[in-house]
Amino acid sequence: MSKKTERQLSSAATQRAAFSFTRRTLLRTAAATAALAAGPAFIKRGFASSGEVNVYAWSDYVWPEQIKSFEKATGIKVNLSKYGSNDEVLTKLKASKGKGFDIIFPSVDTGPTWYQSGDLLQPIDESKVNVDMILPTLWKKSKKLGGVFRRKRYLVPHDWGTEAMIYDSSQRDYKYGTLSYSDLWSEENKGLVTVRQKSSFMGIGLYLDRIGEVPSNRMLDTYKDEASMRAVWDKLLVFAIEHKKWVRQFWNNTQDTLNAFYQNNAVIGQCWDGPSLRMMKETDGKLRYLMPVEGGLGWLDTMAIPSGAANVENAYAFINHLLTPKMGGIFANNSGYNSAVVGANEYLESDSKKVFAEAYPEDAIDRLWWWAPQPAWWSAARAQYVDKLNAA
């Protein structure tokens, strides 16, 4: 990749423009295209009607109901493998040179890292994807967030979500508008916190920028170049190491998060919305998920076809199966994340709608901080800071 292209992908301007994503925009685009969902769900004709498809997905992304209905409709067997992080799937596909799987689910901001890591993904043939079933806002904005490279699309929106604050409301009384990432590091929460190392740096950075202690233009300056990033992250590392004793358990996947609260008695954490909203439902609101004053961390996950996929047509068939309202609803109700499919909200259960409204009150969606496209140098540097925190 040329230096110019890399700068374009990682610039602060790209991050600011990429997601003018608000509650109003989401509702408006969903309503404007909901009529598309009224017709029968379908899988585009012309795909193979037998064989298999090898799916490599996040642990809580593909559900038995989705697999069963797909296999019944197509005769194609789904072989599902699961991973827990973007680093895990990238490492595996690097080692196999893009072979072994037909569909993966990368976060859109990791697109630049994929493109700079070799020929690991193949361009998407948009004529084979039911693009009309994807919320137009997400389809359009995913282009600027990392889904398109050199005028070719590689990443198809699947879902969006957040990483923000979850806490035990029987022991803490936080409110929207005052809850902050800084509450993780209050004296009363010492030894009771769960965070993911690499994203905890972002929460710390947004907090320290807000109070003027470590100015970073809401962390956007860290995407300009490596020197600018390290100037900020060096200071964040000092804070993180000084407060490492506050952490009861680090998490890296959904199961880790569930264990932190259900088994290891964490009281507060910075966690994904999926497991957090699931726990919110399962505990009748005892565990609560809420956006901090600095803004929750917004992300968009996608579907991609590796360069060495053996069952490409079956991969497109499975992608289109997931891009139906009913399948989007099944995903959202089970995972706690938000489907990118037009009409999926019509299949949301009442408790899913309830916890969503409580997690994102007032202007919470408008205030989200969206992960910017991550060039390879940024991801590599972040990994170094995580290693230093782990070793401290």
Q: Which residues does each PLM region occupy?
A:
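N-terminal secretory signal peptides
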Residues: 1-21, 34
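N-terminal twin-arginine translocation
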Residues: 19-25, 36-51
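Mature extracytoplasmic/periplasmic domains
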Residues: 47, 301, 306-367
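Early extracytoplasmic/lumenal segment of secretory-pathway proteins
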Residues: 47-114
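Extracytoplasmic ligand-binding site segments that recognize negatively charged/polar headgroups
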Residues: 108-111, 116-248, 252-256
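A ligand-binding cleft/hinge motif common to bilobed small-molecule-binding domains
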Residues: 110-113, 270-285
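Periplasmic-binding protein-like
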Residues: 234, 238-243, 273, 283-304
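Conserved C-terminal helix/tail region of periplasmic/extracytoplasmic solute-binding proteins
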Residues: 259, 362-392
